[in-house]
Amino acid sequence: MDPYKYRPSSAFNSPFWTTNSGAPVWNNNNSLTVGTRGPILLEDYHLVEKLANFDRERIPERVVHARGASAKGFFEVTHDVSHLTCADFLRAPGVQTPVIVRFSTVIHERGSPETLRDPRGFAVKFYTREGNFDLVGNNLPVFFVRDGMKFPDMVHALKPNPKNHIQENWRILDFFSHFPESLHMFSFLFDDLGVPQDYRHMDGFGVNTYTLINKAGKAVYVKFHWKTTSGVKCLLEEEAIKVGGANHSHATQDLHDSIAAGNYPEWKLFIQTIDPEHEDKFDFDPLDVTKTWPEDIIPLQPVGRLVLNKNIDNFFAENEQLAFCPAIIVPGVYYSDDKMLQTRIFSYADSQRHRLGPNYLLLPANAPKSAHHNNHHEGFMNFIHRDEEVNYFPSRYDPVRHAEKFPIPPAVFSGRREKIAIEKENNFKQAGERFRSWAPDRQDRFIRRWVDALSDPRVTHEIRSVWISYWSQADRSLGQKIASHLNMRPNI
């Protein structure tokens, strides 16, 4: 019998109970004891195996995005973008690619409510013919900080207090008071969008700036946008309390039940592109993850549609063990020098190796559906059967060759080595424009949320003054209104 034909799978379940090694178990209810009331014997291997397995069921949860829900479906190209990219999965309208998508909250634990004010993760894994492509984004188009050096401290500030394990506003406001670049992100997070109704009724964004390369080697910067066809809907405070109090997994259940009922969620994919030769023409840096690209001057271009039409078969295998990394790209898509993207390229894969082990890409949910070949052998939990005699490259005994060369951006770099912020910070303009675009009632809700946060008794007068200064620079009336509610005087 070929042992590799019967790899562990529910498809090969026996009609009776067995141990992990396949031995039959005739009693799964009682331990092996001396008589009916005597001590349990250590030789009861089935009991020991059962308890030992149970003790190790849980794996480390994600340091961020721990709470999540996944679904499967397909991506279909609807518009020709072959002039922009040589990516095979985008080669022509009508091409379909299988996908798995994971939605998530960001800061709190695996079992936390899905009604908290928090960004939502929107990660898509494309199983293309040229390998996997992970587009790992959020439901908000910008981020808190522009340099990954700040990321660990940022997460620490947003996470619960290490002393009492309570998320506290004074810690968040203290940290970000040092970084006015966060203002634009807070204009989204403290807006109504900060609590989506569920995962179906929110947009998604690649957030970072990537690069597309066509067959001729021409490169353009690109931003990815997912637009829900269900409409964007949010929960206001009283609604969030009611929904979360009734069901702390409401968004997970909504996603599952909608797909099970045949009401398949769908998103349209759009892109924005900038020629790198024109990147200096704007009053913002196109590689700054705290900025959006104005759609009136950089219009959205339609690309395709994402449809989720199948629920996952197993939550642990296809959600907890599902792993994404922005470094996983395909020919025709490349990174940019976006500082946050550059750090995510390392950090995500490193985090997955910690959670799942060095061979996490061999797990079924993470492995490519296309043929693949390398000499990354062995290591913990490598369960792939290999019978090659040559595990080095090159070799005259192994016909494997290099793949055909594909274009990458032909950038030339020149400069001094230094740790320095970007020149075009422009931290206040877009946040102010966003606030002024809202109806008065929406502005009032935003102001109330900021007043509530700044009213935390541990927020000092100095920190309140900094935030009033920031919001005044974004919009003078906004800063004045926040100051008035706090019985303070604007300092700008």
UniProtKB/Swiss-Prot annotation:
Subcellular location: Cytoplasm, Cytosol; Peroxisome matrix
Family matches, as SMART domains: Catalase
Cofactor(s) the record lists: heme
Tree of life domain: Eukaryota
Record-annotated membrane-spanning stretches: none
Keywords, in A-Z order: Cytoplasm, Heme, Hydrogen peroxide, Iron, Metal-binding, Oxidoreductase, Peroxidase, Peroxisome
Residue numbers binding heme: 348
The EC number(s) this enzyme carries: 1.11.1.6
EC top class, as a word: oxidoreductase
Active site: 65, 138
GO biological process, one term: hydrogen peroxide catabolic process
Cited InterPro entries: Catalase, Catalase_AS, Catalase_clade1/3, Catalase_core, Catalase_haem_BS, Catalase_immune_responsive, Catalase_sf
PROSITE patterns on file: CATALASE_1 (PS00437), CATALASE_2 (PS00438), CATALASE_3 (PS51402)
One GO CC term on file: plasma membrane
Oligomer and partners: Homotetramer.
Job of this protein: Catalyzes the degradation of hydrogen peroxide (H(2)O(2)) generated by peroxisomal oxidases to water and oxygen, thereby protecting cells from the toxic effects of hydrogen peroxide.
Protein family (similarity comment): Belongs to the catalase family.
Name of this protein: Catalase
Organism whose genome encodes this protein: Vigna radiata var. radiata
